[in-house]
Amino acid sequence: MTNKYLSFITDEDLFECIEFLYTEYEKALEGIDFDKFFKNRIDTFKMTFDMGINNLSEQDWLAAELQRQVEKTITNHVGTFHEKLIGKIEGYTNYPVGYDYDVAKDDNTLFAEIKNKHNTLTGTHTKSLFQKICGYAEKYPDAICYYVRIIDTKSRNDIWEFRSGSIDENTREKPRFSHPRVRIASGDQFYKIVTGEEDAFKQLAYNIPIALDDWIETKRAKKGSSLGLFAELYQQAKANNRTLSEEIISINYPKSNYISF
């Protein structure tokens, strides 16, 4: 068991988490066939400006558009990647979908709900998550419970306090939500908590690119999954004596029954 990349997780465990995320990337991109690509319609004006202003080739634009279409799915899976990674740390367990919490310390003194970005939750979802985490705190009186935002606007490890709901007629303020053992933590702070190492998140940020390249090289995995769709569109454009952009325009708008197409 070696620790070439991270001091707190073995290379084997890290590679297992990388393989999970790589597989999810492949599923998401390969799941976009010809029909799905055009399902929500392409903004061909933005396409034209993107390629012209950013000096993108047609294939580069297509790869970027595919990435945009799967962005939400991939972002969720990156959050799961962190859950799985933290679950590999000694003394912690990652729980699959269906359990009340994402990660817990085996002695029941820490529970966490992990989101990948600070803007994942909005409105009533914030209140619902808070109440859910409060439930862990009430059930386990010795536990500190966390709402973790891996990519946050600042480094933090604070009691989670916020206001939400209708404004009270007397106080002229929205109801305040807080619990002494429910905290909000950024990715750097939470990795420090679960590993005991100040630079744990920094290690991860700098060494993931190296580990990913090594894993891809070892597995001889392919980079990028847009070539199949590109080839299909290119061959169709060639047969119709059009550029790729013209072919996308000719497919896109008739699907919405636009005038003159």
Swiss-Prot record:
Record-annotated membrane-spanning stretches: none
Enzyme Commission identifier(s): 3.1.21.4
Alphabetical UniProt keywords: Endonuclease, Hydrolase, Nuclease, Restriction system
InterPro entries in the record: Restrct_endonuc_II_Eco47II
Keyword Hydrolase belongs to the record: yes
Region forming the signal peptide: none
GO MF term list: DNA binding; type II site-specific deoxyribonuclease activity
Entries under Pfam families matching the protein: RE_Eco47II
Protein's GO biological process: DNA restriction-modification system
Reactions listed under catalytic activity: Endonucleolytic cleavage of DNA to give specific double-stranded fragments with terminal 5'-phosphates
Protein origin, superkingdom: Bacteria
EC class: hydrolase
The protein's assembly and partners: Monomer.
Name under which the protein is recorded: Type II restriction enzyme Sau96I
Organism: Staphylococcus aureus
